[in-house]
Amino acid sequence: MRDPENVLNSLQEHSAQSGYVYDRLYRNLFNREFFLRAYQNIYASQGNMTAGTDGKTIDAMSLERIDRLIATLKDESYQPKPSRRTYIPKKNGKLRPLGIPSIDDKLVQEVVRMLLESIYENSFEDASHGFRPDRSCHTALRMIQNRFTRCKWFVEGDIKGFFDNIDHNVMIGILRKRIKDERFLRLIRKFLNAGYMEDNQLHQSYSGTPQGGIISPILANIYLDQFDKYMAEYKKRFDRGNKRAVNVEYHKLSAKRIRLKRKLAKAQSEEEKQSLLESIRELDKVHKSIPCKNPMDTNFRRLQYVRYADDFLIGIIGAKEDAQAVKQEIGVYIAEQLKLELSEEKTLVTKATDRAKFLGFDIRVTPQSNHTKKTKSGSTARNYSGHVMLEVPTSVIQKKLLELGAMRIDVRNGTEIWQPTYRGKLVGRTDLSILDQYNGEVRGFCNYYAIANNRSKLHKFRYIMEYSFYKTLACKYRTTKGKIIAQYRIVKDIGVKFQDKHGNERIRLLWKDSLARDPYPLGKEADIIHKPKGILKKPSLGARLKQIGVNGAEKKLQRW
């Protein structure tokens, strides 16, 4: 059997060739080495230690079990088990269904995922950022900040119930364009049709991908890559003109200024010179208050597009009618070609100087400015306008603090007052556990909004969380907040002393890193287009699995 890394590298070589068709993919599922690699990948994920409908976890894996699984794949008797449905909370307070596959299904899905990623990753559009290696919400937001400059309108897009409404026939049809292997496609259809178990009842799946399934993200991207490519072609048709037309009034004033400067050079008397200088100064004030290009040039249009999962944002340089036409046309395409529907309440045409919502941020374009300012050299220059601002909404901070139970809102004289409060659910924990809980929550929230232009707003979030921490410890020890601050003060910081496993005293401090804006929270390399590198060689787990499987003994792995 070929080394999986060589197989995946070979598949990647043709990934960017849109017309290349792959065949004989299914035979890779007979390769034990692929399953050992899949085992390594899954074992690294704590969430994949959750038992599926078969009641087993990855720790129960053995070589014999892998061989039996391969045998069922060879004769196509393999049938995925219905996933066990559970629910996780969403940001809006509702619950999101999540399917937990059996461990055998996780392994097969991971092998399929590796194959699909090698085939498709290099062919995905640059505008796609969700569920991709080296891509994130931050890379999507940076693309918006870099490319949506001077946009006049936003089209906020949201596909209604995307993961639950993916059409299975459309999905297989899209895959068939690049994959000529019916056994491989039948396997994917089996996963799509596997259904789920809830309250001991089987529910069949007629559309959608299993949320929680390992292959769901890559299948979702393959599906919506059709929309990404449609938008790339739409942009080519939409864009018009090489540059904006000149502003006639601006250039008239420029010509007038030149004439005045010439007169000044020829002026004889001091009185005439002063008069001309005053005229030039007055002219400069008007000159610098109007744009040099015509911002309403109907012969200049631009469209920008960014997508993260089923949310997308379109920026338009053009008229409102252009933005409305874009919204209507993409709605028709999504309905007719992808059998999906845009959410009417979430798909909006928004003026760019107002605020569009995307990935938890408020996004706006700074309005046209007629003001000038002094530069470091002492000259005057026009304030730059039209750049994109990424902002953390106050409502998001408020909602997060209320969800965590870290504050209450009092109303005094009609004004809301945010008050830190203790968190009763944490009182029973150790001091170190309480500190770690707060540190993790503050660090995670602040790091996500590191790219925000108004990141200073996070000081209030951290302040509320800090004093909620004090009040939680005060509640635990039935004392006052002031005494807690004095007791846990370590020089200028606040921290908890504890002993490590060797009995040495350690100190962990309350998180107070800088809240200065970080435009590259993941590093500049995060914006570089990803090139798949195959599978990293990590032989330890596979080698251990082989040792356990010696002589065909059915031995279970223990966690190490």
What are these regions (language model features)?
Residues 1-560:
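Non-catalytic terminal/accessory segments
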